Amino acid sequence: MNGTRRAFLGTALGVAAAAGVGTIPAAATESGPSRPIPPSGIGMHLYTMRTPLATDFRGTLERLAEIGYATVGVSGRHGNSAADIRRMLDETRLKAVLEHVAYDIVKGAGLPQALEDIHTLGGKWIVVPSLPGSLHSPAGYREAAREFNKAGLAARESGLKLLYHNHGTDHQVVNGVSLYDILLAETDPELVGFELDLYWAANGGAAAPGELFVRHPRRFPALHVKDMAPNGSFADVGSGVLDFPAMFDTARRGGVKQWLVEHDSPADPFASALASYTYLSRLRY
């Protein structure tokens, strides 16, 4: 670690401690919850870091590794090939677990190349980040479920698994039907899983994530751990109002393997990354 980065980490840790960020949650007392998140399961979804990645991809990965992150979810390559990113990941001792790939690619002729690229990255999941607005109806989500099953079969044949990442509108009830429930009910659990974004699930009025884990076991191998400020905006993990210990209590039943930090608009991406990592690494549930 060079002097500049050592100074950054030392200063940021001091700020986090002074603000109470990253301290052990009150619920995790000596007589309370004791389960930690495995260090290998704490990752960063790279959309959070898109601004520094655009100018210094490798340096950004290096700083994430120095903070303590073990894994990343790829979202935007910033002009790099999958092989380029894999080389930088190997050099910084980070592991990519997934990549976000647009719906039109996943259901089209670009799927084989996308699957090959995820193998190159070293990942295990291909993730559809959102659905087009034109599908925002029960009929549209049923169409998407059919496409997911087809793409999920191709993914399984290549040794990967297809996941879907939610936003708030996915949890809306249209004509008396929850759109997200359509995807859960009409996709094959052997072929399709879900990357549950905790902020958007809460923002969209979904059932508590812990309830989803119980109702749909082993369908949620990855999470986007994103916090909500009291005014509803985004917040560093641990600084907002979401009750992560309660959400994680049934995470094992949900099949959660990766807790990927995300903040859609951090004022300082590295300070946000540090504060969020510190909180998750100390969390007990």
What are these regions (language model features)?
Residues 50-54, 73-83, 102-110, 133-139, ...:
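Acidic-and-aromatic substrate-binding clefts and catalytic sites of carbohydrate-active enzymes
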Residues 40-45, 72-74, 96-101, 126-128, ...:
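Hydrophobic faces of well-ordered beta-strands that scaffold small-molecule active sites
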Residues 44, 64, 72, 89, ...:
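Conserved, mostly hydrophobic/aromatic
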Residues 157-245:
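Acidic/histidine-rich catalytic cores of soluble enzymes
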Residues 1-16:
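N-terminal secretory signal peptides and thylakoid transit peptides that target proteins
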Residues 23-54, 62-63:
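C-terminal segment of N-terminal export signals and the immediately downstream linker at the start
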Residues 33-38, 61-66, 80-96, 110-123, ...:
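Acidic (Asp/Glu)-rich catalytic clusters
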Residues 78, 104-193:
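Active-site acidic/histidine proton-transfer and metal-coordination neighborhood
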